[in-house]
């Protein structure tokens, strides 16, 4: 039976030690020590097995019975040759785990059983034999169980206690342990904080060197309560699993430790401790925010320079306050300010001009709808009427050479190109010969003497809208992405006629001839009369001036001859509408009747350079299909007109150039695709 139990405890089928069977064997040996001989004999047999697992399980069982059983087992282990068998196995170089287990057991036993003069010297003899064989004993763990089990002081729990021996005199004294404290609750933590604050206030009010006040009953009681709470907090930290309660307990423990340390320092007579009691808490808050300067820029330079000298009451709040909203300065050097109500400025397209203001009370612009789909915007924003100057300088060339380019202000509409209906302000191509300015809603009131094209004595004073835009021409902006730069020697001719405004909406003054908004299409500048918006049809000659209207599509493709008859009929209606206005404004025309055409006929009469070389510089091209502005020509060049196919009217182009051959009374159908 005993051998069967040992066989089951050391079976090779086990994954690990069968502790239930091992303890059962120990109980059997403790109850019947006579069974120890058979058990030790069976274990010795299993130790000599060739299976390393069986050897390890047998060694584990041997260790268990040596530690848990009495002197009878120790004697049989020493006398039955178990130690000698273990030394022999080590010398045979067995499995590593088996060898290490044997070395640990022999080293432990030789120390426990007392050396060569002990009761059982076999343990020490086996240890010395292994040392002579060169075995290296591993270091023992200090947490290993002792070889001898301490004597039993209480009856086993598995057996019922002896009720007859029960009495007050037979009670076994319990070992002294740490006193149990009830777990701290949130309310008790708050109470402890209040007691700690009262003690801290009393300590801070003490005079330096006065130890008599420390003996007051109230202070002694507070110190005692703080020490008790500190012990309870330590117990709470070691036992609780609530994270929030643990966090508050740790914070309370730090505060209690600080206050008790200050109390002990005052009691020991250390100088300068009573005045430093409340400082650590406030300095801790400051150090988290302000080390060398404020972590958050509040916009106050004094706080940044002297961040450490701020008041203790508002120091932390000032550091944690959100920064004030930045103050926008529209007149500094901002490129665009479309949202502020005080400074309404448009983006200067060219390079920055330090000498010219961008946005001020005298230089305010009205915001217009930059993305309107129709040029005849029913409700454009207008500038205040009381402001005399309403244009910003957008032309660096005109600003740098105001005398030589006085005629540049009239370049709008001078070559017969105007914004196409249906495109926004940014999509409308601004050709090099001029486009009506969309940025001014009222004519300016500052007359300047410009140099007109003919420079004859019959020239009238400049119109008010040209006087303001003389030096600043948006269409001649060299850096504009929408219009190429203009040649410095260009001149154009303007008309000093008022705008014929028949619709209820305010008109946009143009640097060229005024605009008549009777039709949705713009007409070319005509001698002595206002100009309507674009019309994609050619104009009827009036007063000897041939005014061809050139739409955007004429630049990219030839005009269709089959539509000329219908267009001439429509132009006849326009001619009748303009006849009245022509008679009223006939006396205001310039000396040269061809000045409004914009091709430089007046310069040709003056003997100047060829008009094409001067007027075609920087002329940009726009294709109706792609809606993209072509790159400007960098040098003065002659751009030949795009000739439509199969047009018999090409022979009339000589009449346009030669003024002497021009017949004002006979209408001629001009080219629609000329530049």
From Swiss-Prot:
Gene3D superfamilies attached to this UniProt entry: 1.20.58.160, 1.25.40.90
Annotated ranges, domain VHS: 9-138
Pfam families in the record: GAT, VHS
Statement: the UniProt record of this protein carries the keyword Membrane: yes
Main location: cytoplasm
GO molecular function: phosphatidylinositol binding; ubiquitin binding
CDD domains reported in the protein's UniProt record: GAT_GGA-like_plant, VHS
Expressed in which tissues: Ubiquitously expressed.
Record-level GO cellular component terms: cytoplasm; membrane
Gene Ontology biological process terms in this record: protein transport to vacuole involved in ubiquitin-dependent protein catabolic process via the multivesicular body sorting pathway
Protein location: Cytoplasm; Membrane
Polar residues composition-biased segments: 299-317, 372-435, 470-481, 488-524
Feature: compositional bias, Low complexity: 436-451
UniProt entry tagged with the keyword Metal-binding: no
PROSITE patterns for the chain: GAT, VHS
Residue span, GAT domain: 180-268
Record's compositionally biased regions (Basic and acidic residues): 646-661
Subunit structure comment from the entry: Interacts with ELC/VPS23A and ELCL/VPS23B.
Family: Belongs to the TOM1 family.
General function of this protein: Might contribute to the loading of the ESCRT machinery.
Protein name as catalogued: TOM1-like protein 9
Organism: Arabidopsis thaliana (Mouse-ear cress)
Gene name for this UniProt entry: TOL9
